[in-house]
Amino acid sequence: MQGEPLHDSHRPDLIEEKATAHMNDRYELLILIHRVVGYPTAFVVAPAALLAFAKPALHRQWGKAYLYLLTFLYVTGTFLTFAGHDWHTWDFARNVVFNFFGFSMVLYGWRAIHLFRQVGQPIPTRLDWVLAGMLSATVLGLLVVAAVRDTPMRLFALVGIIFCVLEFRELRDGFQPKSVLFRRHTRFILASYFYVLTVVSIVHLGDELPRDLKWIWPTLFGGLVIAATGNAARRFAQPRGKLLRLAVGATVLVAVLYAGYVAYDLSRDMPVVGQGNADMRTQISPR
């Protein structure tokens, strides 16, 4: 005797299909939220914080907003990376290491300005050595990824090595003179912002620039800016001098022009992820 057919709600294949569709909807919603938060962070909050660098109270407010938003973007982006990619692939390892390296810059920068604002001459504590160890471990991860392949990863590993050399030299010297802490703050915060611009470049300049160039141009430009700001802040009496204003102005100008292009790119209502780099959609600007 033939049994009665299963109701749709009891069919395992349909239950699994509905569950998958529900998960996909949540995934897409998180991507949308990630994008809605990401673009203002890159093109409004961060430039506003840079422009307010000579007004400590205002700069601090925008800086806190940048820290909180970037933390949100890192957490959601990391979740999307783990949820949307095969964990055994090189691309997955690259994304995890690269994104943590970029995000961690804001932590080092925040620690530096916290010490800079203290009365007297701060000295490195156990936390500072732990952060230095974290930076070293992250750079080691970049070196492992870069050893497999990829010119941009090799450049980022080189940048990381330079940061490590500066890090341990400044720790050895006990953050003296105190202006070192201001240099550390500008170095790391700017590095975090150029990381953000790198992610946006990967997403929106996939067809306009060669594959390696879209990854590295923010680092090349950022290296010049960071070198200029570091030189401007070498003396405690001149942490916000003319050269620093020029470097910050150039960075904001690039951000404004870049924001205009991104707005145009989004308005075209077509996929903007470069071929072969869809994995980067899980970061600041997912698609």
Residue ranges and their predicted role:
Residues 4-22:
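Short, Lys/Arg-enriched N-terminal segments with co-localized hydrophobic residues
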Residues 17-287:
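Alpha-helical membrane insertion/targeting regions
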